[in-house]
Amino acid sequence: VRYTDNGSLTDALGEVLETTPTHLRIATKRGPVDVPKDAIETGHEIPPAPTRPGKLHEIVSAEDLRKVAAATWSPREIAWLHADNLASELRGEDPKVLSGWLLRSAPATSAVNISASNTSAAANSALPLGDPGMPTQEALSLAVTWLKERGSTPHILIHTQAHSSELSPASQQVAPLLRGEGFVPSEPVTTFTAPTAELAQLREPDGEIVESDTPAPLHYAVWGIEESAREEYSHLVSSAPQHRILSAIATGPDGTQTMVGAARVAFAMKWAVLSHLVVHPDSRRAGVGSALVTASARLAQARGVRSLMYEAPDRERSDFAHSCGMSEHHRVWMAQPASE
């Protein structure tokens, strides 16, 4: 954020910690800075800060990549579970702390089972990212209550640290409590990352790659989205700061055109997030998936985005990610009630 301070322009570079009607609190290297909103001249998005030396797509924390993913899949109902926010609500004030546990609810999508990703569960989840300012057991109970009150099947998203089998600090606090509360973990989902410059050279499409802003009914059908969930799911699809729907089109000998693959690529925090990548069974191992990855990476490059992430919920998709040259970054589990 660039703002005026005592008549001079100055910059505050960092993560927004709090927002009030009059100020932003930004975590900078020199400590928290309160920036008057009426003094802001301009602002722009920056990628997550590196945590160690290395390749750009490998040096961000798992927590930051979870924030990137959340920014591209944002339901209408979102809240940060933090003791300070609860205190603000008791005083009749708007919550202002943007840390702790991220709560998301999109109840119409709770029953959607997406084979290509965990997106429906993520939209109805509690994501522990930091200290909620209260005992973990209390935070878990409040998160479950918040989700159930909104008609969402509660999921608790836990994850490892980057390039490690160890759980993240926040996940370490909540994971031991889950089974006692009747939660069971999903199979692990592997988060992959890669530089867009390399993916952009992966494969030229044999057919046509068509871009659009919104999914067609056929997209919802191949993604397994029932009619009753499509309105809310459409909001999720378009919730990223920027996104594109990609369709791979094949032309038959008689000139008939058929969609043989589809994907969604979304952009936030100088990252591309590839999801909903599906290929028609008759077109697998024909390069359709690789062509969609290439097209996504080229769209990212055109926006100055240098890194891409992709989540693989099973061995087949993990093998595909490896074949594209992607690297494993961290793993995610969705804990859900055992009765679900």
Feature map (PLM): residue ranges:
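Short boundary/loop segments of OB/S1/cold-shock single-stranded nucleic-acid-binding domains
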Residues: 1-8
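Flexible, substrate/cofactor-facing loop regions flanked by secondary structure
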Residues: 202-276
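SH3/SH3-like beta-barrel fold
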Residues: 23-29, 35
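Conserved beta-hairpin
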Residues: 88-102, 167-180, 242-261
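Conserved acetyl-CoA-binding loop-helix of GNAT-fold acetyltransferases
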Residues: 136-145, 276-281, 285-302, 323
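N-terminal charged segments
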Residues: 8, 17, 41-146, 170
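A short macromolecule-binding patch
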Residues: 32-44
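Acyl-donor-binding surface of acyltransferase catalytic domains
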Residues: 109-110, 136-214, 224, 310-319, ...
